[in-house]
Amino acid sequence: MKGYSSGQLSMPSYGAGTANSEFELITGMNLDHFGAAEYPYKTVLQDTTTESMATVLKNYGYKAHAIHDNSAAFYDRDLVFSQLGFDTFTTKESMNIKKWTENGWAKDQILTGCIMDSLDSTKGQDYVYCISVQGHGDYPTTQIIENPEITVEGIEDEALKNKYTYYVNQVYQMDQFVGKLVKALQQRGEPTILCMYGDHLPSLEIEDEDLTYGNKYQTSYFMWDNIGLKKKDGTIEAYDLGSEVLNKCNIH
């Protein structure tokens, strides 16, 4: 991925709060303009629509799809995604999930087929917002993975070491999912921009001084494409990422 745009995203939360990171990404709104500890999915979006990536792209003929390998009701997404302009919402209730983490979350490998199905469901262009769940907490304090592919060293606290061992092995498998998704998109051949990001760092007692770069309110993102876009790296706010994608599509 070194040849593609990447960088750090400044997120509104640490350790939890996926829905708020998601809200900023989809709407381009800064949560600082909302109430303290407010979740717009639980408040204003219950009975109000708003402009979003989905509504903007639909004005250009796109269909908008949301996908999540967890319950539709999680964070009330089943209620608010229509308010955000999505045409379809595919969740675990309609997925044939056969592989689960040791902690009971769906493994993200199921998502490649779901994304391809959404892209194939129309003859035109599509906007797909996909939320993965494999790396979700809580993280087990006991060793529940037999023969982990990735081992952890340098942590004396056994419970914390077990948490990290579980987490990094999920991330390893999620990375494999990303590779397979990129390969599937390459084979499909349709002009595509794939933007991947982390919604927040995990709740693993992380402090700024533990990090090689950035701070605990920053996550990584990258944008893969098959249309020859110019590489542009940098640190941006989460609510600006959608605009970056639209700019690459020459939509202003």
Language model features with spans:
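Solvent-exposed soluble domains appended to multi-pass membrane proteins
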Residues: 1-252
